[in-house]
Amino acid sequence: YEIPKRDWSSDVCSSDLSGPDGRPEHDIPPLVLEMAMEIEDAPRHLGIHSGGMVICDRPVIEVCPVEWGRMRDRSVLQWDKDDCAAAGLVKFDLLGLGMLSALHGAVDLVREHKGVEIDLATLPQDDDVYAMLCRADTVGVFQIESRAQMATLPRLKPRRFYDLVVEVALIRPGPIQGGSVHPYIRRRNGQEPITYLHPLLENSLGKTLGIPLFQEQLMQMAIDVAGFTPSEADQLRQAMGSKRSRKRMERLRLRLYEGMAERGITGDIADQLFDKMAAFANYGFPESHSVSFAYLVYASSWLKLHEPAAFYAGLLNAQPMGFWSPHSLAQDARRHGVVVRTPDLAASGAGATLEVCPESHGGFAVRLGIGSVRGLGSDVAEHIELERQRHGDYRDIEDLVRRIPEITLPQLEAMATGGLFGECFGMERREALWAAGAAARSRVDRLPGLESATVAPTLPGMEPIEVAVADLWATGVAPTGHPTQFLRERLDEMGVVTAERLATIDATKVWVAGVVTHRQRPATAQGTTFMNLEDETGLINIVVSVGCWKRFRPVARGAAALLVRGRLERVEGVVNIVAEHMTPLTVAPGVSSRNFR
C-alpha cells in the first residue's frame, strides 16, 4: 500500500470528529491513522535542559539511568523532569540573569570606591524607591523597564513589596490575553467591586482581588472547591499546563467535578470554575518565581535611587542585557545628573568604573571601559589594563603597540576615534587617528622610534556633533550629547515639543521628534505597533495603528529617527502619542533601535 506524501499532522489531532453525514472530516488513510495512534504520547525527540540540575542523597546512577552528554565530562539523566520529581529527586532550573551580574558589579564598585558594604538581602523598605516606581522611572530596572511595564506602574501605584510581586506576574502574555490586567487595576483603584465566582474562592484569590495570577492559586482553588490533597492539586496543575496530558486530565476532571459536587457546586457554576481553571493553567506564573523576581526589581530600583553611578556602571558592564541599549542607559544617567565620561587609556579599566566627580549626582562619575570600544574585545582590554598595572602608564601610542603586540590597526583607529588618547596624551581625535596609523607599524621586532616619528599635520578639532558621531561609532555611547540636542534650535522653530513638556503642555495635537529606541508589535495588540522615541530630555511613547503603519511603513520601519505628529493622550499618569503622520529625521548616524515582538 503506497501512502501519498502530504502533511496530515493537523488532521490527526481531530481524527475523531465526523461531518454532518457521519463520515470523518479528513482523508487520512486508515493505516496512517493506526500508526499515528500507536506513537501518540511517545517522546518526539531527546532534549537537554540547558540549566537543569538534580540533587540526590546517593550516586544518581543508583536511582535513574544516566548517559554521557556531548560536552566533555557532562552527564545527562535519561528521565524527564516529571519522572525525576516523582522519584524524589530535587530538581533545579538555573536561570542566567544578566541583572545578577549587574547588581554584583554595582555592589563591588560601591565597596571599592566608597568603602560601604551593601547587603542586598537586607535592604530597607524605602518609600522613595516606591515613589520612583510610581513615576515609572525604571530605565535599567529589572523586569519593569519595558514600555508595557512602564505604562502600568503609574496605574498600579506600587507602595509595598507584594505590589511588585503582582506587577511582575501581571504584565505577561497570559494575563494580558486572559483579560486579567485591566480588571485587577480597576479593582485595586476602587473602580470595580471585588467579586468571586463562588465564595470558596475567596481564600485562594483574596490577595489578588479575585483575579487569578499564580500557579499556586490554581492549586489552592482545587483544594478549596473540590477537596483535593496538595499532591492531587499539583498533579492538576501539571496536567492542565501540558498538551500531552489529555488522559490524566480527563481522570482529574472527573475527580474535580465529584469534589465540587460534594460541596454543592454543580451545573453552570462548576463548568465555569473548571473552564476558568483550565484557561488560567496555561499562563499562571509561579508565585515563588515572582517573589524572587520582585526582589531583584526592588534591589535594582534601590541602587538606581541611592547609588546611581554604580548602578549604571554595573549595567554597562553586564551588556548585552535588558531592554535598553548602552546609549539609552547613558542618556538616562545624564538625565539623572550622573556624569558619563568617554573611555581613556590611562584612566579606564577594562570595564566601566567610577571616578570622584563633585559635579555628578552622588559624587561619582561613570568612566566607560576600554572594552566598550568596538572590535577590541574583553581579552585585549583586560591585557591593556593588566599591562598598565604591572609596568606603568603608556607613554604614547607607539608604546601601547609595542607592549600589546596583538593589537591591530582597526582597533587602534577605533580607540583614536573614541577619544581614548585625548586626556592621557593630549591628542585631538583626528591627530590621534593619524598617529595610530604610523604607530601600528611599530612592533617589538623593530627598533623604537623608526616608524612613528612622522609628525601629524595640523588638523582641525571635531565639532561637538562630530564628537557625538565618533563616540556613537566607536563605543555605541555618546556621553557628551544626544543627537537631537544638536537639532533643537531647528526643532523649536518647527514647534516640536520635548519629552519633558508632554506631561504639562496644553494641546491635543503635537509634533515630537527623537531617535527610535524600540519597535514592538505584541501578539496581544491586534496589529498595533508601539514605538519609543528618545530626545535629550526623555522618552516618548508612540502608538501606531494598523492603518497608520500601512501608510508610513517604509519610514516607520526603517528610519533611525522620526518626526511624528499625533494626538496627545494622558491617562492615569501615562503619556502617549497616537501617531497620525511620520517623517524621517536626519540625525547623527550610529544609533540603532531594538525591535521586539
Task: Please give the residue ranges for each predicted region.
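Single conserved hydrophobic/aromatic residue that forms the stacking wall/gate
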Residues: 1-12
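Noncatalytic, beta-rich nucleic-acid-contacting surfaces in large DNA/RNA-processing enzymes
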Residues: 10-597
